[in-house]
From Swiss-Prot:
Disulfide bonds join C138-C155. Gene3D superfamilies: Rieske [2Fe-2S] iron-sulphur domain, Single helix bin. Changing C138 to F/R/S: Photosynthetically incompetent. The lineage of its organism: Bacteria, Pseudomonadati, Pseudomonadota, Alphaproteobacteria, Rhodobacterales. The main subunits of complex b-c1 are: cytochrome b, cytochrome c1 and the Rieske protein. This is Ubiquinol-cytochrome c reductase iron-sulfur subunit. Keywords: 2Fe-2S, Cell membrane, Disulfide bond, Electron transport, Iron, Iron-sulfur, Membrane, Metal-binding, Translocase, Transmembrane, Transmembrane helix, Transport. The chain crosses the membrane at residues 18-35. It is found in: Cell membrane. It comes from Rhodobacter capsulatus. Residues 94-189 form the Rieske domain. Pfam families: Rieske, UCR_Fe-S_N. InterPro entries: Rieske_2Fe-2S, Rieske_2Fe-2S_sf, Rieske_Fe-S_prot, Rieske_Fe-S_prot_C, TAT_signal, TAT_signal_bac_arc, Ubiq_cytC_Rdtase_Fe-S_su_TAT, Ubiquinol_cyt_c_Rdtase_Fe-S-su. [2Fe-2S] cluster binds at C133, H135, C153, H156. Changing H156 to T/Y: Photosynthetically incompetent.
């Protein structure tokens, strides 16, 4: 009887297969922790998105919250702020990109930088931006500061308008807008 006709497994074949299976299990057990450690930890997942109640924010005022370790400005603009921002021609801006994570590649018009309400209408009333100067990472002052009625960074003199667009000073870009949306009439979800 030749070896090719012998279909019954021998003890040696069993040991080969058992050793190979054990090797696969041991390798998987060793590699799994290395792969699993690349997943986000619970504290990082908890910081990835927050809900902000804006029911107490009056027209013409601003709320600052901390998200992912950075300040976020939430301003409820009045009609004067909205009209001022919408009257600026795109060609007069240093940075013509909206820098809006909700609208990648959009132009820096006021409509592309403001946040739509829960019903989807965008009156320009709400503006949500990271409160970090795009020059060197300082925190600009709000309350209609600076030469353009928006924010002013006292560190190096950057002036932002009422839509958070850079108008004067060394900052190269508009203030960044994070992923944000209303989840109901009075709550904004960041992230």
């Amino acid at each position: 009887m030749s070896h090719a006709e012998d279909n019954a497994g021998t003890r040696r074949d069993f040991l080969y297969h058992a050793t190979a299976a054990t090797g696969v299990v041991v390798t998987g057990a060793a590699v799994w922790p290395l792969i699993n450690q690349m997943n986000a930890s619970a504290d990082v997942k908890a910081m990835s998105s927050i809900f902000v109640d804006v029911s107490a924010v009056e027209v013409g005022t601003q709320l600052t919250v901390k998200w992912r370790g950075k300040p976020v400005f939430i301003r409820r603009r009045d009609e004067k702020d909205i009209e001022l921002a919408r009257s600026v021609p795109l060609g007069a801006l240093r940075d013509t990109s909206a820098e809006n994570a909700n609208k990648p590649g959009a132009e820096a018009t006021d409509e592309n930088r403001s946040l739509a309400a829960f019903d989807g209408t965008n009156t320009g009333e709400w503006l949500v931006m990271l409160g970090v100067c795009t020059h060197l990472g300082c925190v600009p002052m709000g309350d209609k500061s600076g030469d353009f009625g928006g924010w002013f960074c006292p560190c190096h003199g950057s002036h932002y308008d009422s839509a958070g667009r850079i108008r004067k000073g060394p900052a190269p870009r508009n203030l960044d807008i994070p992923v944000a949306a209303f989840v109901d009439e009075t709550t904004i979800k960041l992230g």
